[in-house]
């Protein structure tokens, strides 16, 4: 059976600042989506990460389907109206256009979609991040799909040994989407050359070279390229298929336990570690530490199993404690050096404007 998974995410308002959506907003979004299960949709699941609401939709309409995207737009718009009625902060923040134009690409919400023929057992993960950048998944996915130090299946499984093809997007290209495809392990150094710069380059998708099957897809939208100004971080979502011809689910744990430094945090202008958290966790009041959650599902004839929260077991409490130490050390450095993003990546323009004013005082 050919199935499409669509993951769509947006910040449409939150309680007391950038924390979490209200119960009423979540309920309205889920109500709109649930009305279409059994009609337009095969199944659906709604959750949040920080103040971002995430929709997981299963259907047979293919990627970029107008009806599916219109449903997500309707859910986010109606949720926004509830947020406005409640006086929530940033109501409708990620909805950058007034009207739906056929699909959600370019309208603000993050979108990751994948169409594939369902295997007899089809395990997959949904990853969702908040308070960070599109390239935040670069290192974890690189290590899981290309580094046998972290993904032992690359050595142990004949299905994985031929490696994976990485499709990488140049986020600096604003006129059109610009991609390059590189094969691991042969082009490993070239892949690393690009992915090290998570501000400019981001993984868009990953493919099995032996089977030609898509393994992963990641959203790559930059909100400021749409709005022309800072309107929030470009936190990614991803769909990752696991097991058999792909890395095992548990091989994705150690790569996220690294908690790499990424762009984001308060005002989207700092480097901080990416903390693995449970789904439905509010954004941290400790400078909005960048966060990622992961839910694993099994899929059968387009129907979703109940999810398992990948970052909820006791091991992750120890990981989070170390992430907090990394975050505290970086924040102790305040505005100085690598603690704050370079000028071209700062989401707020205050420093650039101040520098222009100061230029007149130089002699």
From Swiss-Prot:
Entry binding sites for beta-D-fructose 1,6-bisphosphate: 18, 89, 102-103, 131, 243-244, 267, 348
Binding site for Mg(2+) 4: 234
Binding annotation for Mg(2+) 3: 233-235
Family matches, as InterPro entries: FBPase_V, FBPase_V_sf
BP terms from Gene Ontology: gluconeogenesis
Gene Ontology terms for molecular function: fructose 1,6-bisphosphate 1-phosphatase activity; fructose-bisphosphate aldolase activity; magnesium ion binding; oxidoreductase activity
Binding residues for Mg(2+) 2: 51-52, 130, 235
Required cofactor(s): Mg(2+)
Superkingdom field: Bacteria
Database matches in NCBIfam families: FBP_aldo_phos
Comment on protein domains: Consists of a single catalytic domain, but remodels its active-site architecture via a large structural change to exhibit dual activities.
Quaternary structure, from the entry: Homooctamer; dimer of tetramers.
Protein family per UniProt: Belongs to the FBP aldolase/phosphatase family.
Family annotation (PANTHER family): FRUCTOSE-1,6-BISPHOSPHATE ALDOLASE/PHOSPHATASE, FRUCTOSE-1,6-BISPHOSPHATE ALDOLASE_PHOSPHATASE
Record function comment: Catalyzes two subsequent steps in gluconeogenesis: the aldol condensation of dihydroxyacetone phosphate (DHAP) and glyceraldehyde-3-phosphate (GA3P) to fructose-1,6-bisphosphate (FBP), and the dephosphorylation of FBP to fructose-6-phosphate (F6P).
Record's protein name: Fructose-1,6-bisphosphate aldolase/phosphatase
Source organism: Thermus thermophilus (strain ATCC BAA-163 / DSM 7039 / HB27)
GN (gene name): fbp
């Amino acid at each position: 059976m050919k199935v499409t998974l669509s993951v769509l995410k947006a910040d449409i308002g939150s309680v007391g600042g950038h924390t979490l959506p209200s119960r009423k907003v979540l309920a309205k979004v889920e109500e709109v989506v649930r009305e279409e299960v059994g009609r337009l949709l095969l199944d659906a699941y709604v959750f949040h990460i920080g103040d971002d609401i995430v929709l997981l939709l299963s259907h047979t309409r293919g990627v970029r389907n107008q009806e599916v995207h219109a449903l997500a737009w309707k859910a986010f718009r109606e949720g926004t109206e509830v947020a406005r009625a409640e006086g929530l902060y940033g109501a409708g923040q990620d909805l950058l256009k007034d009207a739906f134009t056929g699909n959600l690409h370019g309208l603000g919400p993050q979108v990751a979609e994948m169409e594939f023929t369902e295997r007899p057992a089809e395990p997959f993960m949904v990853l969702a991040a908040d308070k960070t950048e599109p390239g935040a998944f670069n290192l974890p996915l690189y290590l899981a799909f290309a580094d046998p130090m972290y993904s032992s299946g690359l050595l142990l499984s004949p299905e994985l040994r031929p490696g994976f093809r990485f499709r990488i997007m140049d986020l600096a290209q604003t006129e059109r989407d610009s991609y390059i495809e590189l094969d691991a392990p042969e082009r490993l150094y070239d892949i690393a050359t690009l992915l090290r710069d998570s501000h400019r380059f981001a993984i868009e998708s990953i493919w099995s070279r032996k089977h030609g099957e898509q393994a992963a897809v990641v959203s790559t939208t930059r909100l400021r390229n749409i709005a022309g100004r800072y309107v929030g971080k470009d936190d990614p979502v991803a769909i990752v298929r696991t097991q058999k011809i792909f890395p095992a689910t548990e091989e994705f744990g150690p790569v996220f336990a690294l908690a790499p430094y990424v762009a984001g945090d308060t005002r989207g202008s700092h480097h901080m570690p990416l903390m693995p958290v449970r789904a439905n966790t509010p954004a941290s009041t400790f400078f909005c530490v960048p966060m990622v959650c992961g839910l694993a599902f099994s899929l059968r004839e387009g129907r979703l199993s109940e999810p398992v929260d990948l970052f909820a077991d006791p091991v992750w409490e120890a990981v989070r404690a170390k992430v907090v130490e990394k975050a505290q050390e970086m924040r102790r450095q305040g505005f100085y050096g690598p603690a704050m993003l370079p000028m071209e990546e700062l989401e707020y323009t205050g420093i650039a404007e101040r520098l222009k004013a100061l230029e007149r005082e130089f002699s």
